[in-house]
């Protein structure tokens, strides 16, 4: 399916796409992406799925990139998530694009009531002209 025929475009950004090898957020690259998103967002619904919270958390906490236990990686991600969202928010604001955040766990997709609630949240964000 081509983008022009799609109603919703989901953009998946991996850690190495948004965070450089030194653990810094790639502002210039993301800024360029947002320019493109602004154009598509006129006619399409856009969803951004991004990684990078652990990498930014490691940078902020000055933790060297190495294997860390799950419990610690979740804490590092919790800290990094704040920085990740902040960076995205600043860049989207420059383009006057509203954004929202939806945090989803596997349980949310496996239980019908929760899945319907998530769908409703997405639809309401689209109604508000915000990019989740």
Language-model features, listed with the residues they occupy:
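Nucleotide/pyrophosphate-binding catalytic subdomain
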Residues: 1-131
């Amino acid at each position: 399916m081509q983008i022009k025929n799609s109603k919703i475009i989901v953009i998946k950004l991996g850690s190495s796409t948004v965070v450089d090898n030194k653990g810094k957020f790639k502002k210039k690259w993301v800024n360029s992406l947002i320019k493109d998103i602004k154009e598509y967002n006129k006619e399409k619904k856009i969803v951004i799925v991004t990684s990078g919270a652990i990498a930014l958390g490691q940078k902020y906490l000055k933790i060297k990139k190495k294997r860390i236990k799950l419990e610690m990686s979740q804490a590092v991600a919790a800290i990094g998530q704040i920085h990740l969202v902040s960076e995205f928010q600043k860049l989207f604001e420059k383009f006057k694009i509203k954004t929202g955040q939806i945090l989803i766990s596997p349980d949310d997709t496996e239980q019908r009531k929760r899945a319907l609630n998530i769908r409703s949240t997405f639809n309401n964000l689209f109604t508000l002209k915000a990019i989740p």
